[in-house]
Amino acid sequence: MIRLKNRFGKANRKEMSWMSDLMETLRQEGISPDLLCAVEEYRAAHPLAEALRPRIPAPAFVYYGREVWEQALAALLCGENLLLAGGKATGKNVLAENLAAAFGRPAWDISFHVNMDAASLIGMDTFVDGTVTFRPGPVYRCAQCGGFGVLDEINMAKNEALAVLHAVLDFRRAIDVPGYERIPLAEETRFIATMNYGYAGTRELNEALTSRFAVIQMPTITEENLEKLLRAQFADLTDKYVHQFALLFLDLQKKCDSAEISTKALDLRGMLDALRLMRRGVAAGPALDMGITNKAFDSYEQGLIRDVIAARIPASLTAEKLFR
């Protein structure tokens, strides 16, 4: 993924400006012109109510990966729901947000957990001025408004809770609200689920639910894309350390893959945070401890992580040598 050089999310920029920036960036990345044309036709055919426009994401990053983009766009244009499966730091949530922005649809982020139940998704009765009133949940609102529902870490919830999504995600495209009416999904509604397979606290998705998604296995970020990300985030970072930090992340990834360290240290956000700390004057050693090393609480593992870091980045490195 790469950063869109401050073109997104500024209050003084109009929606169409950053949306056109996104589409132009996708063209530059070689995404199929036919798919991009179809997305623009989709937006034109499905105008959005003014009240919902603040819900259209204004991403700070754009996901980088032509093949994944083309698969995702084609699936959504065909009316499919997406399941983005992959390890840590593969850009699942970034891509989900980007897709909602590209299609110009309002997004509802739904974070799953072990205590999630049907009422959390669809809605529940509540009191308003002494009267029992139905308070719609995020899935209900998404269905009504033709939004994109981002089902974050869908395999954290119990399968019993997820059963309410079956009719939403298959050909019926409807929600039966107990005690109320049956709600058909708006034509524009799509759901994009994300999951990390095999993490603590996660469960196997049952076959019935999985069959309702088109599944994309998210690839790990490459050295080239890491360097693009670092240059976009830190334009003044020297070429030498752009390369070294990219290799550091890949070294940590290899250690995780071989089970020498846990995935706690494989934290791209943490690396970027550490670089921001270094820019503020914190030396590389303490900054990388805060951003990466200390996220593993075992002292032996911390030692292994520090050894990996020391092979690439001197602990005494300061901002004067790191940035131009």
PLM regions with names:
Residues 1-324:
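C-terminal regulatory/interaction module of P-loop NTP-utilizing enzymes
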